[in-house]
Amino acid sequence: RGSGVNKETKLAGFPHHSLDTYLHKLVKAGHRVAICEQLENPKLTKKIVKRGVTDLITPGVSLNDEILTSKKNNFLAAINVLDDQFGLSLLDVSTGDFFLSRGSLNYILSLMKNFEPKEILISKKDLKFLSDTNIDKSFFFYVDDWMLNFNTALKNIYDHFNVKSVKGFGIDKNNIGLISASMILFYLKESHQKKLSHVNKLIEINITSSLMMDRFTISNLEILHSKNEGGKSLIAVSYTHLTLPTTL
């Protein structure tokens, strides 16, 4: 509608009954969708019914079947920088898979290429370190700098997992990737108000115990994608009785 002017007004919202039609299209296009609902019974009030945001659907945080792919993780990532080292964490909210790592910029970029996160949390303070990379900046969502405080991050990690140390996960307490892991937890609890009880384990991706491949090798071996439908190498472990191999 023109709203009384000679130019069109961009779409800002749509009725709830059209949710199934538009939600997956908007989120797959990289947009963030806030779902607003009535917060009180209209029969019990004579005033305007209160409405509020009850859910926030973003590219990296969704449980909608139309958005998720059954044989592919949907990762939310977070990146932080400290003393020329990069920390990276990845969480699939739908499965609870939670990973962290640390290393050089090239190593982190290699992990990003392999995991293909749909949304990336980063502070504007650290953005300059990624300015010359080929990461799609439209995937970025900026978080506050206070989340980068190491002590704050450690406390958040301890509180979430109800532990007094991360040694049980095989992770050194000085691992800077813990900051990015905490960023994800803060973001989901504050912006999305998600219950994360199913996120009960944190796994470190260690460069010394991993076989790293650059994007050209992965492409040439057709591990994740193939020029022919159904021809990628991961198809070989998808025909199993267990669901785990399809998301390895």
Question: Which functions belong to the PLM regions below?
Answer:
Residues 1-242:
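Charged catalytic and DNA/RNA-contacting regions of genome-maintenance
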Residues 243-247:
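A short, hydrophobic C-terminal helix/tail in secreted or cell-surface proteins
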